[in-house]
Amino acid sequence: MTTATSGLKVKIGDPIPSVGQRATDGYLLNLRSLVGKKSLILVFFGGPTFKGAARERGDAMAEALKEAYPRLEKQGVALIGVTTDNEQQQKAYVAELGLPYLLFSDERRIAVEVLGIPTTTERGNTNAEPTAFAVSIDGTILDIVESAAPKGLVARLLEAIFPPG
């Protein structure tokens, strides 16, 4: 049985909340710690505990972000991926896909709860639905993409950070 939740608790124009997370490399980071330093693309997606088509969607997102990472780095934009898997599962996932960006574990779903990220529970595993945020250097949420699909996502978020003209 699959169940879903929804209801974002933040909106465009809000400050990114203060939420601490641990990356697969053990690095601890509060989302607010980048304020004043870098713009941020923050993407929640289903990770290694999903199976079948849901896993394929998560893998596609991880790979799309991997492809975009050099461009983001060149433009001075931080990229953080977040799944609700534990650190051990994520370490294997990062190694398997060769992900160059920080992937944070929200196993206790603290960030998911604070931001109101939709989740899906399947076979006892609760995973974040694909949701992406563009955050300005001053910490303001510039864009939110719910049910985010990999194609065109990074371009849309970069346009929010660096508007044309």
Where do the language-model regions lie?
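Chalcogenol-based redox active-site neighborhoods
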Residues: 1-165
